[in-house]
């Protein structure tokens, strides 16, 4: 069976890897670089070469069981990381989740508002866990839930909204539209509403270390620099057109791309999938890799792995302290910042680029449920982290679920993955998909 995978993020890589021994699989990527959000930049830091991740950075044993098994199968080396969190307000108000940083400003020790803020966090954790168990928050947005329980602006602006915005790379006002049940489920699963938190890890040498191992396993099945531009019906077949017109025929095609990218490729004959995908949106985030501490909290004691700098405008400004996250040399301060109103100093900036992230709301959740119901019909499969909560484990699960549905195999017992049978019509008719691509 010939299968094409379009897109080389975690979903496409895992799908192609799981299919490599059971099918004639080809992986297409429009860029020359393979890996999607698994992106490692090499910086020249005063003559010293340092590898820095700017997309996927960390994972944990509790919430990423398949990713851990994937890394074990690839023999990927990993190490401990840190996941502390800080908020810095334009008014000068700052705090971080580590003990030293919680009272980074000594005035917080004696500030009744700060103690009320701390009690509000505990109250949120208690009520959210209770209502999660009772399922009373179904079809309720986070904003409506916060209103119902009377959480004040201090709690919203300095804890729950910046934390949610940082996790999902989403403007704070959009977080108010996030489905409350999904929000609480994520916080509970990641132990963010509990005293005991999971230990986080990072890939030694950067995420490109695992990408290189997957690419090596796939060999000449990888076709970089091949952009698929159109997907349409062609009788009982499906035609995929790329930028230079070379043609290939496959039995199944997996579009392992962002939802908006898949939407742009699909022709009118796939209007059912197009209709669903229109409800799932992505948002660009401007990212800088730099060494400018001006984009960190003012108090050094408040510095954390994740630092939200609240600013005017709708975009969140988030700075990752990469030395803490990836155990990089402290003598070489390195930061990755998303969406600052004022970019880092030019002479302290190594590179800038854009990553797009999925935006989640109730219509998007409903659309994903419908896509899962029809996935594979007509030989067309959709996969991506956007089909879950947008994280690396979600992308891996989506890719593996699709691959296992088509007979792929992995050397572990998959967790929380439910393969579906390829639709009988496709199997019976042997419908082919035609791909027009650049690398014959």
Regions found by a protein language model. Give the residues of each.
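Helical element adjacent to the flavin cofactor pocket in flavoenzyme catalytic cores
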Residues: 185-243, 248
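Conserved Rossmann-like nucleotide-cofactor binding loop
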Residues: 11, 33, 260
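N-terminal Rossmann-like FAD-binding beta1-loop-alpha1 element of flavoenzymes
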Residues: 2-27
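Mid-domain catalytic core of redox enzymes
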Residues: 227-358
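Mobile amphipathic helical/loop "lid" adjacent to a hydrophobic cofactor/ligand pocket
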Residues: 61-177, 184
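N-terminal glycine-rich dinucleotide-binding loop that anchors FAD/FMN and/or NAD(P) in oxidoreductases
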Residues: 41-67
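Conserved flavin/dinucleotide-binding core of flavoenzymes
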Residues: 42, 98-99, 103, 315-440
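Glycine-rich FAD pyrophosphate-binding loop
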Residues: 20-43
């Amino acid at each position: 069976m010939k299968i094409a995978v379009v897109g080389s993020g975690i979903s496409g890589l895992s799908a192609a890897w799981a299919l490599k021994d059971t099918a004639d699989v080809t992986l297409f990527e429009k860029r020359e670089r393979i890996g999607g959000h698994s992106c490692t930049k090499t910086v020249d830091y005063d003559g010293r070469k340092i590898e820095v991740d700017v997309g996927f950075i960390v994972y944990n044993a509790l919430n990423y069981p398949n990713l851990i098994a994937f890394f074990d199968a690839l023999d990927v080396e990993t190490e401990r990381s840190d996941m502390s969190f800080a908020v810095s307000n334009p008014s000068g108000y700052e705090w971080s989740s580590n003990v030293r940083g919680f009272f980074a400003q000594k005035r917080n020790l004696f500030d009744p508002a700060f103690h009320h803020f701390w009690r509000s966090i505990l109250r949120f954790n208690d009520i959210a866990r209770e209502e999660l168990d009772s399922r009373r928050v179904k079809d309720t947005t986070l904003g409506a839930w916060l209103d119902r329980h009377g959480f004040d602006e201090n709690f919203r602006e300095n804890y729950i909204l910046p934390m949610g915005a940082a996790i999902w790379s989403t403007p704070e006002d959009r977080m108010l539209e996030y489905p409350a049940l999904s929000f609480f489920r994520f916080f509970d699963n990641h132990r963010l509403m509990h005293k005991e938190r999971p230990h986080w890890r990072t890939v030694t040498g950067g995420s490109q270390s695992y990408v290189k191992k997957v690419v090596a396993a796939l060999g000449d099945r990888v076709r970089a620099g091949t952009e698929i531009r159109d997907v349409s019906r062609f009788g009982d077949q499906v035609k995929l057109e790329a930028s230079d017109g070379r043609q290939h025929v496959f039995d199944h095609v997996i579009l392992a791309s962002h939802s908006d990218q898949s939407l742009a490729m699909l022709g009118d004959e796939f209007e059912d999938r197009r209709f669903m995908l229109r409800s799932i949106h992505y948002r660009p985030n401007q990212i800088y890799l730099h060494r400018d501490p001006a984009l960190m909290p003012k108090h050094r004691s408040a510095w954390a792995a994740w630092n939200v700098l609240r600013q005017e405008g709708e975009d969140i400004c988030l700075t990752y302290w990469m030395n803490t996250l990836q155990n990089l040399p402290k003598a070489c301060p390195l930061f990755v910042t998303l969406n600052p109103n004022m970019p880092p100093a030019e002479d302290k900036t190594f590179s800038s680029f854009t990553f797009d992230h999925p935006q989640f709301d109730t219509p998007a959740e409903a659309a994903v449920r419908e896509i899962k119901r029809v996935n594979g019909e007509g030989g067309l499969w959709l996969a991506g982290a956007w089909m879950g909560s947008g994280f690396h484990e979600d992308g891996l699960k989506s890719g593996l679920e699709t691959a296992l549905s088509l007979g792929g195999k992995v050397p572990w017992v998959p967790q929380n993955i439910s393969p579906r049978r390829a639709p009988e019509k496709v199997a019976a008719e042997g419908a082919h998909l035609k791909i027009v691509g650049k690398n014959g």
